[in-house]
């Protein structure tokens, strides 16, 4: 029939009449109620055939043609409530033993499943779909009402009885038919749980008959919950293919149920509902008060229009009597009349379906609450671990029975049951605290009941799913995953507070694994930053996750001070650079670069965690905007959600000291309205006082900051970028220092393969040509050519000039483009070629952009010769033997590792210790040690090894006392050697600070010393008598003693050495230039005068001196050379008369290798009758 031409008085035929006639005839032939007994259903003669024909019509007409005509006809014919349910009742009462009736019952189940299948709104709906979908939705609600309340019979129990024979068969013996029957049974239960009244359609009858409470009560009364518990607890053994369907049933039963209310008793639940009702009434009264402030009055039925004169002398027109109240109301009315056509982002409308509606709350009656709580507790005790382990593995291996929607259902259901477990434990603790004797006798349960979702496999699966959903912008999946992650964190936090040590250890291990990965940290930050109109559910989930993660990570980092995390950023960046840097890629260099890359990866994979650094990543405008968008719902938020937003803003403003991010007009306006109104928070809420204090402190800081930074008045209109935040916070721009790049390793040509410079140049040129760097070689040739021309012109000009010849000027090396400029720094082979052609770099710093020159020492002929050689290498082909690669002849330059040299300069520096042993060092803090050279250290090590091998068979191993004595002796020797070393490492910048008074005193003392010195010199020149310069004159030895001879020295000898050392230490502040001693000097003048001061000087002359004297003597090149010959003669005469023979124990071991030879005391160095000695060792 033509629908467009149908008259208005006739009803439009929405279904083909032929289809309707065929379907109606099948329904009629199926059977009906007999007139004699109206309560008894009578089957037709071919009832089984009729049921199978109806099934074929559904499959071949509706599914094949993507239509809903047959389902519409069956709904209009009331097939389900009028035929199928009475047939199932008839089978359950009298026909279970009949095989024919069992087939008919199974055929009824095969029809019930597609007729109750949830209607999914496809993306491309046809006219047929739009026409039939609302009717079929209402029809399914009627189906559910009839199934749940069909007289005195239990339809759900009847359906379960149909599947029991297949359940009783062992898994290995089940046929395909048995698996199909189990699947039909579970899908029917799933459909009943999914069907719910459509809020946009008018409901027929009582809605309570099809509500969630009615469904839960029916599942409990008709043994559906017992069936689910049985199958969930054995899902891995007997029911491996039914795991996904069981997950769907659980999801649709528990979604939207408030867990807190579920575990309350009747009194607590009643008080909770009373509080909720009081809040709603108070909210309604506040709305009425706000409306009454501006509501029209009884006499305000006349129109009003006024002119408002603004500050700029312009006039605006405003209408309405409410503008007459005051000026503020008038301006507010003007603002409301303004319209801004803000461009809207065209987003695909999010379709709220049964699978992603997480946030719609569901209210249960008391009976349904008790039944569901009982089922949840039993499921947590027996079925949680087997079901979710099996489902996770099925999702990971992408089984055929798994759909995309099942991942979302898995994470949401896991999150719901984890929260239920935590709330159940909290109520048990509360009961135990109140004195429940039945609970006091029971030990606290461990968290092994939910351990299947707290293992490493689940964390890996969760992190991978979160990253995939975030990358693909799948909002619903990501919301479910964030809820699951949050509940896992809260469960682990409760495990850490468990009285069982095993749970505490497991919780610590889990936190370590979660917080160890920096990718998890970055993902959470990216999710919070990336919020943009994804809905309140997504906003609530991401803010809760960020709040819980931050709080737990802060607590964990405080307990574990040495916490480390694994970061992959630097490793990836370096790997990418290594792939792109093929300009430095010969074999040996590449191998060393790979070693450096591996080292960099090891360093970057694990680093010490800094919580302040991580928390600072939440201090940006994007995160603030996310929490501001969440706070805008403050009228609908509960106490926990308001506390969550309050803690974040408190952290931003006071813990991180980034309150500048909150100084924006819309944010300040929101905070003000929350406290002062209109539409303020309820002042009776416990969180109101905290918000009031926070807002007051933020506004106070903003006013104070405006006084300090007047530019903030303009910045109040805009979001803050990092540079603006830094300027407003500190008053100046942030100073950034760019990190300088390191130059490449210095290369060289193997000297065994190339002897001359020409051969080396040929090798380098050939290797660069092979590496496709011919343009750089040509550039070097061009630079040599231009430099030769310029140098040739300069030389010809010098030949014609007759004056003094000036040196050749240096010629700068200029790059022809930017890539060449970069290659001058980064290309190691180009730098080697430039070095071989004798280019030089100006300055000591090897940085990008450093200047290179052609030195003045190169003549034009040298430059021409070098260029001709390079050109010859470019023109002739590369001739190399097959067994030798020219690139292997270029290697890193040995012994020129600047990094190692730089490290060696400070490797052996000892800055002393805080231990008590350092107080005995005579020179105060220890100076850096004077290490032996590498060669001498190696030789000494070899000698010690040989000596050990010889003594290995002769001597026994030293005991602990000997080893301790040797160690103490080595330490004393090291301290004695270090105490004598002077270092310039302790010269500080503060030494250059001037002090006028100290300078004046210093110059006065210097002037006094000079006058006294001049007077002594004048008297000595006139009279030939040397006065006593100091009582603390020092003596020096002539021979160096070994350590083996120190223990044989006499007591008096060692005491005299100690006295002289103390005298030298005390005289360090004296003049360091020349010390003139007279009392103990053996000058001929003093001997001839017979000075009494020389009588006692001979007592200390007998001590043999060390060879340090000879090493420290400086050349006799002063102005007193006129007495040089005379000093030699006199000193030679006095050597025989004044030097006493040494002690016998010092000379009888001349042939022994370990005894040091004792040299005769050298002569005194005389200058005009004065003994010249150095006071430093």
UniProtKB/Swiss-Prot annotation:
It is found in: Nucleus. Residues 1086-1096 have a biased composition (Polar residues). GO terms for cellular component: replication fork protection complex. Residues 575-597, 791-815, 874-1001, 1021-1177 are annotated as: Disordered. Belongs to the timeless family. Forms a fork protection complex (FPC) with csm3 and which is required for chromosome segregation during meiosis and DNA damage repair. FPC coordinates leading and lagging strand synthesis and moves with the replication fork. FPC stabilizes replication forks in a configuration that is recognized by replication checkpoint sensors. This is Topoisomerase 1-associated factor 1. It comes from Neosartorya fischeri (strain ATCC 1020 / DSM 3700 / CBS 544.65 / FGSC A1164 / JCM 1740 / NRRL 181 / WB 181).
């Amino acid at each position: 029939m033509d629908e467009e031409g149908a008259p208005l008085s006739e009803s439009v035929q929405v279904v083909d009449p032929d289809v309707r006639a065929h379907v109606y005839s099948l329904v009629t032939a199926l059977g009906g109620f007999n007139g004699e007994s109206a309560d008894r259903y009578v089957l037709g003669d071919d009832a089984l055939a009729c049921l199978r024909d109806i099934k074929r019509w559904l499959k071949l007409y509706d599914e094949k043609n993507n239509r809903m005509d047959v389902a519409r006809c069956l709904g209009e014919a009331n097939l389900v409530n009028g035929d199928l349910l009475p047939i199932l009742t008839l089978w359950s009462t009298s026909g279970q033993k009949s095989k024919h009736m069992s087939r008919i019952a199974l055929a009824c189940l095969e029809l019930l499943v597609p007729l109750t299948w949830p209607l999914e709104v496809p993306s491309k709906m046809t006219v047929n779909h739009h026409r039939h979908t609302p009717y079929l939705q209402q029809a399914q609600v009627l189906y559910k009402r009839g199934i749940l309340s069909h007289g005195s019979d239990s339809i759900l129990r009847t359906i379960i009885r149909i599947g029991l024979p297949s359940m009783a068969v062992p898994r290995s013996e089940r046929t395909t038919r048995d698996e199909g029957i189990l699947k039909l049974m579970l899908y029917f239960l799933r459909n009943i749980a999914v069907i719910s009244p459509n809020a946009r359609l008018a409901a027929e009858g009582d809605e309570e008959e099809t509500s969630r409470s009615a469904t839960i009560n029916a599942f409990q009364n008709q043994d559906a919950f017992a069936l689910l518990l049985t199958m969930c607890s054995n899902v891995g053994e007997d029911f491996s293919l039914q795991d996904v369907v069981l997950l769907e049933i659980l999801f649709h039963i528990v979604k939207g149920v408030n867990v807190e209310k579920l575990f309350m008793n009747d009194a607590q639940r009643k008080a909770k509902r009373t509080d909720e009702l009081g809040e709603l009434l108070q909210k309604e009264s506040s709305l009425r008060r706000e409306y009454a402030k501006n509501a029209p009055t009884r006499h305000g039925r006349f129109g009003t229009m006024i002119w408002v004169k603004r500050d700029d002398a312009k006039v605006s027109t405003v209408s309405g009597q409410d503008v007459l109240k005051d000026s503020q109301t008038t301006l507010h009315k003007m603002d409301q009349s303004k319209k801004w056509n803000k461009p809207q982002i065209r987003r695909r409308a999010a379709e709220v379906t049964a699978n992603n509606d997480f946030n719609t709350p569901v209210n249960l009656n008391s009976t349904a609450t008790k039944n569901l709580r009982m089922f949840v507790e039993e499921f947590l005790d027996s079925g949680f671990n087997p079901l979710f382990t099996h489902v996770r593995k099925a999702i990971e291996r992408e089984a055929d029975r798994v759909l995309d929607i099942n991942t979302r259902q898995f994470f949401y259901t896991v999150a719901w049951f984890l929260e239920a477990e935590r709330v159940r434990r909290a109520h048990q603790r509360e009961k135990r605290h109140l004195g429940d004797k039945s609970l006091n006798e029971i030990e606290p349960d461990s968290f092994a009941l939910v351990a299947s979702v707290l293992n490493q496999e689940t964390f890996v699966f969760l992190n991978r799913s979160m990253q995939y959903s975030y990358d693909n912008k799948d909002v619903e999946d990501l919301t479910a995953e964030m809820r699951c992650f949050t509940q896992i964190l809260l469960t682990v936090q409760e495990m850490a507070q468990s009285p069982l040590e095993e749970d505490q250890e497991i919780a610590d291990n889990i936190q370590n694994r979660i917080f160890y990965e920096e990718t998890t940290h970055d993902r959470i930050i990216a999710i919070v930053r990336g919020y943009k109109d994804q809905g309140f559910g997504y906003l609530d989930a991401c803010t809760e996750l960020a709040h819980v993660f931050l709080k737990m990570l802060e607590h964990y980092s405080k307990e574990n001070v040495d916490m480390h995390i694994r970061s992959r950023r630097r490793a990836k960046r370096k790997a990418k650079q290594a792939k792109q840097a093929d300009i430095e890629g010969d074999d040996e260099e590449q191998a060393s670069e790979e070693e450096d890359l591996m080292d960099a990866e090891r360093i970057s994979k694990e680093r010490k965690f800094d919580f302040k650094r991580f928390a600072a990543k939440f201090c940006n405008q994007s995160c603030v905007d996310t929490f501001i968008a969440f706070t805008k719902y403050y009228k609908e938020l509960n106490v926990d959600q308001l506390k969550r937003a309050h803690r974040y803003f408190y952290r931003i403003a006071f813990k991180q000291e980034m309150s500048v991010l909150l100084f924006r007009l819309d944010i300040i306006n929101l905070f003000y309205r929350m406290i002062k109104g209109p539409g303020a928070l309820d002042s009776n809420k416990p969180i109101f006082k905290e918000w009031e204090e926070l807002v007051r402190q933020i506004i106070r800081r903003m006013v104070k900051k405006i006084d300090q930074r007047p530019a903030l008045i303009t910045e109040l209109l805009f979001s803050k970028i990092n540079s603006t935040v830094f300027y407003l916070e500190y008053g100046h721009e942030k100073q950034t220092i760019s990190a300088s790049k390191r130059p490449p390793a210095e290369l060289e040509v193997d000297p065994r393969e190339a002897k001359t410079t020409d051969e080396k140049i040929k090798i380098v040129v050939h290797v660069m040509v092979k590496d496709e760097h011919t343009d750089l070689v040509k550039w070097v040739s061009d630079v040599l050519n231009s430099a030769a021309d310029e140098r040739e012109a300069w030389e010809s000009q010098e030949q014609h000039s007759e004056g003094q010849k000036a040196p050749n000027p240096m010629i700068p090396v200029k790059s022809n483009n930017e890539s060449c400029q970069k290659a001058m720094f980064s290309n190691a082979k180009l730098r080697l070629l430039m070095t071989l052609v004798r280019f030089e770099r100006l300055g000591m710093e090897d940085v990008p952009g450093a200047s290179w020159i052609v030195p003045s020492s190169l003549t034009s002929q040298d430059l021409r010769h070098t260029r001709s050689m390079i050109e010859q290498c470019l023109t002739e082909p590369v001739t190399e033997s097959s067994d030798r690669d020219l690139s292997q002849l270029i290697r890193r330059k040995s012994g020129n590792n600047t990094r190692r040299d730089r490290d060696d300069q400070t490797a052996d520096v000892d800055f002393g210790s805080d231990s008590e042993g350092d107080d005995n060092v005579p020179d105060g803090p220890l100076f850096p040690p004077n290490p032996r050279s590498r060669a001498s250290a190696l030789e000494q090590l070899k000698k010690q090894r040989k000596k050990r091998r010889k003594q290995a068979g002769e001597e026994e191993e030293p005991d602990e006392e000997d080893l301790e004595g040797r160690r103490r002796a080595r330490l004393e020797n090291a301290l004695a050697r270090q105490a004598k070393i002077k270092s310039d490492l302790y010269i500080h910048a503060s030494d250059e600070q001037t002090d006028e008074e100290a300078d004046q005193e210093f110059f006065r003392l210097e002037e006094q010393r000079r006058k006294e010195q001049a007077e002594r010199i004048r008297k000595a020149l006139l009279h030939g008598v040397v006065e006593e310069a100091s009582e603390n004159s020092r003596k020096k030895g002539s021979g160096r003693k070994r350590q083996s001879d120190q223990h044989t020295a006499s007591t008096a000898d060692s005491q005299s050495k100690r006295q002289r050392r103390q005298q030298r230490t005390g005289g360090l502040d004296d003049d360091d230039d020349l010390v003139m001693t007279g009392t103990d000097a053996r000058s001929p003048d003093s001997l001839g005068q017979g000075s009494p001061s020389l009588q006692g000087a001979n007592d200390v002359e007998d001590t043999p001196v060390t060879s340090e004297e000879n090493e420290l003597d400086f050349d006799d090149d002063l102005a007193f050379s006129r007495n040089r010959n005379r000093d030699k003669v006199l000193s030679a005469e006095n050597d025989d008369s004044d030097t006493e023979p040494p002690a016998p124990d010092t000379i009888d071991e001349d042939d022994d290798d370990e005894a040091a030879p004792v040299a005769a005391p050298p002569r005194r160095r005389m200058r005009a009758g004065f003994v010249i000695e150095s006071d430093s060792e």
